[in-house]
């Protein structure tokens, strides 16, 4: 590719609405331009990287035995009504009517459409397992699109859907996709973690998210540096931090804590560790035609509630936070001084695992400006219902018993789910088993955010000059920067020869023949993030040398002119092989 025949739309300044590095750099590097909120044009530089991501994803999906097809972006409402997601999905689902007043949606995912294919085409267990995939544009009407391609409304996604006759088959399909994703993100040159996750709005029973590690990531990931354990913080099991409850050593005592409603303030006033205080959170579940059930969830003062874990407890699926009026009615005091001792009306108490093993702890006295110290289970309070209801935190024991938890930030770029029969039962996707009986198909679904990967890769690979692409997804692998291409025969002939050699070696190279000043050339290609640069100048050529600099290198080095192309090609092959 010659730069004079290519579109290079670099900018010196980022748009005012760009908040994070990837958004700023993708605009400045000429990769994207905004059309509307969360909707972008992908300019030639950006599209080249997209196509490289797609190629790696496609190769690994085919290698794993998945079969490519293409489903429509526009889907009839009837399919979504069958699955139940027409009502469940919410305003993110873009709905519209055609000229005949029929309801349609622009697909954010394709579970309904692919299940419709399966129920019409798969009749026997002999036709399974089968795994369909596509790479296609999706649309989710995000309430607040931001961060460029990281949270856009229109995006490119690879989605795959497996169909199996039994649980063993589903487990095998899931394993193949999990392994394929590991290969994909490894080949993309990204630092990532596969984490156990909650299934969210897609539904299902078992899932993993694939996160690119980046400080700007929206998701908190709990992982163990000395083992393979990793999980989304919302899904990670929190083990008790106290192995065994100690015997009471203090008498229960009501203490004045004027104006001290927070655990931190109470601990400071009483000169005790924060870990001896209890945080009381009041939840409610509504009962038709009767007053609500009130729940008191008790956490250690330095811990945070995990609502997803709470929602999975019996009776708490549809919980909400109690109103201040309800709190006063049940506890006799407004929030800030609540506790399980002497409530005004009966409440259901749930203690986190760590709280259940605590002794001599401090709780609210259900009276403004007072707490109760020296509280103990069994003596002062009945034994509670015990559950894991908190988020893990740094320093907690790892659930696999192989170390302690650390926390990092991640950007979700892939997700694999075991859906089971969620969609096949709702939509009547059945097959005849070995005995001729109809059975619901077992499904899995597997997504990769193609365009989101670009943003995530940049968040992990940049400096003050611009993007630093991994070789596998760089728009170009090498840029040739000739000094005086249009003025020096020696420079032009050498640059053209290098270009031909690199093309013949299968290297994705661009020759900058625009006639720009060196500073402009270097700034453009450093901003765009091309991993390797060769500078061809008369002074160096007279000594038989060409200047080489990798995008991550602090200094340039000199290579023999006659072997420079081969040397750079070998560097690229080594990087791609790694």
Curated annotation (Swiss-Prot):
Domain commentary: Consists of three domains: the N-terminal catalytic domain, the editing domain and the C-terminal anticodon-binding domain.
Q: Which organism is it from?
A: Burkholderia cenocepacia (strain HI2424)
Q: Which PROSITE patterns does this one have? A: AA_TRNA_LIGASE_II
Please give the function described in this protein's UniProt entry: Catalyzes the attachment of proline to tRNA(Pro) in a two-step reaction: proline is first activated by ATP to form Pro-AMP and then transferred to the acceptor end of tRNA(Pro). As ProRS can inadvertently accommodate and process non-cognate amino acids such as alanine and cysteine, to avoid such errors it has two additional distinct editing activities against alanine. One activity is designated as 'pretransfer' editing and involves the tRNA(Pro)-independent hydrolysis of activated Ala-AMP.
User: Alphabetically, which GO biological process terms does the record hold?
Assistant: prolyl-tRNA aminoacylation
Q: How does it assemble?
A: Homodimer.
Enzyme nomenclature, EC number: 6.1.1.15
From the UniProt record, list the reaction(s) this protein catalyses: tRNA(Pro) + L-proline + ATP = L-prolyl-tRNA(Pro) + AMP + diphosphate
Q: Which InterPro entries does the UniProt record give?
A: aa-tRNA-synt_IIb, aa-tRNA-synth_II, aa-tRNA-synth_II/BPL/LPL, Anticodon-bd, Anticodon-bd_dom_sf, Pro-tRNA-ligase_IIa, Pro-tRNA-synth_IIa_bac-type, Pro-tRNA-Synthase_IIa_type1
* Locations listed in the record: Cytoplasm
The record's Gene Ontology cellular component field reads: cytosol
* Similarity comment: Belongs to the class-II aminoacyl-tRNA synthetase family. ProS type 1 subfamily.
Superkingdom of origin organism: Bacteria
Q: Per UniProt, which keywords does this protein have? A: Aminoacyl-tRNA synthetase, ATP-binding, Cytoplasm, Ligase, Nucleotide-binding, Protein biosynthesis
Name of this chain's protein: Proline--tRNA ligase
Q: Please name the CDD domains in this protein's record.
A: ProRS-INS, ProRS_anticodon_short, ProRS_core_prok
For this protein, the record's SUPFAM superfamilies field holds: Class II aaRS ABD-related, Class II aaRS and biotin synthetases, YbaK/ProRS associated domain
Q: Which Gene3D superfamilies match?
A: Anticodon-binding domain (3.40.50.800), Bira Bifunctional Protein, Domain 2 (3.30.930.10), YbaK/aminoacyl-tRNA synthetase-associated domain (3.90.960.10)
């Amino acid at each position: 590719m010659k730069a004079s025949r290519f579109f290079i739309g670099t900018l010196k300044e980022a748009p005012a609405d760009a908040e994070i590095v990837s958004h700023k750099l993708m605009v400045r590097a000429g990769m994207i331009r905004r059309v509307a909120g969360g909707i972008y044009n992908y300019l030639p530089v950006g599209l080249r990287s997209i196509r490289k991501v797609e190629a790696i994803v496609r190769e690994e999906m085919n290698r794993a035995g998945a079969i490519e097809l293409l489903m429509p972006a526009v889907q009839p409402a009837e399919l979504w009504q069958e699955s139940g997601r027409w009502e469940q999905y919410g305003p993110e689902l873009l709905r519209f009517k055609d000229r005949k007043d029929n309801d349609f949606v622009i697909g954010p995912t394709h579970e309904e459409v692919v299940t419709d294919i399966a129920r019409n085409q798969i009749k026997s267990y002999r036709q399974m397992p089968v795994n369909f995939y596509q790479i296609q544009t999706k649309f989710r009407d995000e309430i607040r699109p931001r961060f460029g391609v990281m949270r856009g409304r229109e995006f490119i996604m690879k989605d795959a859907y497996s169909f199996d006759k039994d649980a063993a088959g589903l487990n095998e399909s899931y394993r193949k996709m999990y392994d394929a994703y590991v290969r994909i993100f490894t080949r993309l040159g990204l630092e990532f973690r596969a984490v156990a996750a909650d299934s969210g709005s897609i539904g299902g029973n078992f899932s993993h998210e694939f996160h690119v590690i980046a400080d700007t990531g929206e998701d908190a990931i709990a992982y163990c540096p000395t083992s393979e354990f990793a999980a989304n913080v919302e899904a990670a099991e929190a083990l008790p931090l106290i192995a065994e409850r100690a015997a009471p050593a203090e008498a229960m005592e009501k203490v004045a804590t004027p104006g001290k409603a927070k655990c931190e303030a109470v601990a400071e006033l009483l000169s005790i560790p924060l870990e001896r205080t209890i945080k009381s959170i009041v939840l409610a579940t509504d009962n038709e035609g009767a007053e609500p059930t009130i729940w008191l969830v008790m956490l250690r003062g330095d811990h945070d509630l995990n609502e997803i874990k709470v929602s999975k407890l019996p009776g708490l699926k549809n919980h909400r936070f109690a109103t201040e009026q309800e709190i006063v009615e049940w506890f006799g005091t407004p929030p800030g001084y609540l506790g399980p001792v002497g409530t005004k009306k009966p409440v259901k108490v749930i203690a986190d695992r760590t709280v259940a093993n605590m002794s001599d702890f401090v709780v609210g006295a259900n009276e403004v400006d007072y707490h109760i110290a020296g509280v103990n289970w069994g003596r002062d309070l009945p034994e509670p219902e015990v559950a894991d209801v908190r988020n893990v935190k740094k320093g907690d024991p790892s659930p696999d018993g192989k170390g302690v938890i650390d926390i990092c930030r991640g950007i979700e770029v892939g997700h694999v789910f075991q859906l089971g029969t969620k969609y096949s039962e709702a939509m009547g996707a059945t097959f005849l088993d070995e005995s001729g009986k109809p059975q619901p198909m077992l499904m899995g679904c597997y997504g990769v955010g193609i365009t989101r990967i670009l943003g995530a890769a940049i968040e992990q690979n940049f400096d003050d000059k611009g993007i630093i692409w991994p070789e596998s997804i760089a728009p170009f692998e090498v840029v040739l920067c000739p000094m005086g291409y249009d003025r020096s025969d020696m420079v032009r002939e050498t640059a053209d020869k290098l270009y031909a050699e690199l093309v013949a070696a299968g290297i994705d190279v661009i020759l900058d023949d625009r006639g720009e000043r060196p500073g402009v050339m270097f700034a453009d290609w450093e901003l765009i993030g091309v991993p390797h640069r060769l500078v061809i100048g008369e002074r160096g050529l007279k000594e038989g040398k060409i200047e080489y600099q990798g995008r991550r290198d602090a200094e340039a080095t000199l290579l023999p002119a006659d072997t420079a192309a081969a040397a750079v090609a070998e560097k690229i092959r080594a990087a791609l092989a790694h």
